[in-house]
């Protein structure tokens, strides 16, 4: 009846409803079966206890703070922002940190951007999704390493020139939200006696393979 997704089903506007286009065929199928799709995208990224807090927790970061400038929610009066900055319990080299990220984020592969593979990493920034344009914010926080995804070739050169170690763990690390949201929804379901059947998707939507 209802799909809760992180990325919106309709990312690009539909100008012609041609069912030969796979995305349009998917929309038609959803409508035909009366399925509602809700996408919590940047609001989940910004939320306290949301995407970037989950990633920071998975990386074992302590004493976390916001990466980007904060805003204030007009209802709760809570500050919120995208990205987190924190510290590892123990210092690692750049290569060791990349291997650590691969392990704790359950990745088949990742990309490391580093001028010095032996540079110590202790203070870390993380931002789920495509965070290349925010690397200057990581520099302002004087971090040793930045974990994000979708880094372009030229941005990678800019990062090396700035002396910033970056782990491009890919966009798919945001799939961490599936078990987190499932647990949250089941908790609300029990607390409110909603009697809703909740299922966690088992699909792997990462388009990339590592050879």
Please give the residue ranges for each predicted region.
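Hydrophobic structural segments
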Residues: 1-211
């Amino acid at each position: 009846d209802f799909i809760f997704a992180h990325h919106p089903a309709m990312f690009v506007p539909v100008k012609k409803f041609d069912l030969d286009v796979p995305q349009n065929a998917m929309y038609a199928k959803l409508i035909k079966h009366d399925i509602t799709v809700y996408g919590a995208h940047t609001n989940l990224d910004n939320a306290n206890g949301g995407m970037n807090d989950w990633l920071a927790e998975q990386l074992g970061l302590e004493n976390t703070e916001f990466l980007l400038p904060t805003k204030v929610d007009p209802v709760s009066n809570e500050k919120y922002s995208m990205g987190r900055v924190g510290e590892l319990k123990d210092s690692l080299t750049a290569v060791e940190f990349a291997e650590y990220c691969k392990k704790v984020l359950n990745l088949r592969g990742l990309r490391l951007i580093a001028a010095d593979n032996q540079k110590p990493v202790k203070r870390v920034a993380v931002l789920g999704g495509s965070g290349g344009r925010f690397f200057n914010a990581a520099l302002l926080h004087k971090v040793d390493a930045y974990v994000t995804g979708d880094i372009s070739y030229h941005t990678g050169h800019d990062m090396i020139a700035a002396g910033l170690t970056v782990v491009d763990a890919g966009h798919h690390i945001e799939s961490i939200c599936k078990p987190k949201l499932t647990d949250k929804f089941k908790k609300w379901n029990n607390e409110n006696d909603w009697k809703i059947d909740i299922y966690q998707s088992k699909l792997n939507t990462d388009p990339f393979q590592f050879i």
